[in-house]
């Protein structure tokens, strides 16, 4: 068992995603867990680049307001909302509010080239 406070984990800017920071709460650097957990903070007016992954992930919105765009669908997001994104589903997060959009993301840790490419975007 491990317990830590998220404030003790450094937030890092995500390369190529202005206005987005990440805290690696649980990662593959810790005894090879099967799932990772990240805390993202997206600044007002900022958006992630539309992208896809070969793995599913779940998102829990902690604070703020935004929009998640998946394919042809757009859904408003707010505190307490949960999002499931299927493998290979194109998606994007947009902060449509006046405060930071803060959300947790949990996903299986992909192995191999796909993971290396995604992981390096935050270095």
Give the location of each predicted region:
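A short, N-terminal "cap"/entry segment at the start of jelly-roll beta-barrel domains
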Residues: 1-34, 114-123
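Conserved short histidine dyad/triad with adjacent acidic residue
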Residues: 38-53
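A short hydrophobic beta-strand segment most commonly corresponding to one strand
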Residues: 39, 84, 99-114
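Short beta-strand His + acidic residue motifs that chelate non-heme Fe in jelly-roll/DSBH
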Residues: 48-50, 68-69, 85, 91-97
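A generic "binding-loop/recognition-motif" signal
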Residues: 54-55, 73, 89-90, 99
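Glycine- and acidic-residue-biased ligand/ion/polar-headgroup-sensing regions
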Residues: 55-66
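Cofactor-binding loop segments of dinucleotide-utilizing enzymes, especially the Rossmann-like FAD-
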Residues: 63, 71, 108
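Short acidic-glycine-tyrosine-enriched beta hairpin
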Residues: 72-87
């Amino acid at each position: 068992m491990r317990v830590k406070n998220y404030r003790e984990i450094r937030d890092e800017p995500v390369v190529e995603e202005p206005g987005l920071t990440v805290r690696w709460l649980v990662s593959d650097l810790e005894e090879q867990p099967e799932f990772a957990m990240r805390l993202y903070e997206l600044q007002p007016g900022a958006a992630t680049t539309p992208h896809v992954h070969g793995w599913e992930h779940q998102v829990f919105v902690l604070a703020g307001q935004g929009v998640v765009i998946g394919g042809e669908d757009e859904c408003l997001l707010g505190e307490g909302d949960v999002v499931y994104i299927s493998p290979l589903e194109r998606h994007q997060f947009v902060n449509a509010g006046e405060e930071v959009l803060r959300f947790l993301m949990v996903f299986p840790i992909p192995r191999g080239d796909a993971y290396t490419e995604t992981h390096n975007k935050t270095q």
